[in-house]
Amino acid sequence: HSDSVNGVFPDIRTTDGTTWQSISANMPPALPGEASFAASGTCVATQGGRNAWIATGGSAIARILATRDGGDTWNAYDTPLVSSPSAGAISVAFRNPWNGIVGGGDLGSNDSADAATSNDGGRTWTLTNKPPVQGSIFCLSYVQGIGHHDLEAGDHDYDNAVVITAETAPNFDSGSAAWTPDEGQTWFQLPGVSGYWAVAFATPKAGWFVGNGGQILKISF
């Protein structure tokens, strides 16, 4: 996936990891200036071999581009996140084909972090309560992680839990982090967690933040 060029998203697809084909003709037309933020590298999320979502910004509306057939067809859906040439949806994650969360903000503002959830595969989005972080949400991750089918019984307490990390302008070398047990209805700060650009989980007991200067921080629930 790439920023739009002349109104077209120059996206490519692989089914074997070796060969690639353009699916640009399958993508929705881009809005003027529409792009995806590099930030944490989580502007694209997948579920299985057929479902994928792309978070965008940089234009008048922050959108989610979604496919349910492996990229043969795509639809664009509006989100309520702030959007402008320096703002939009930055990170997206889904815990199953229907339930997901997207986060972002304005890279030029330190009071713009926002997030929204979907329960219909990305078609409609509802703002969460305000996340208690400064800057823009660079990354978010479900705590259930990539191994959620093999979780221990107690780990399912975290099926709806999400961790976010945010960075502040202008240098994006400091910031804050928080987590929610219920997809944004309630939030809790993670004191002392600052300067991390991305977070991901294998299981609730094994998650990692990565950030400036080669920082790595393990987080466990």
PLM region spans:
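Residue-level hotspots at or immediately adjacent to binding/recognition sites across diverse folds
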Residues: 1-221
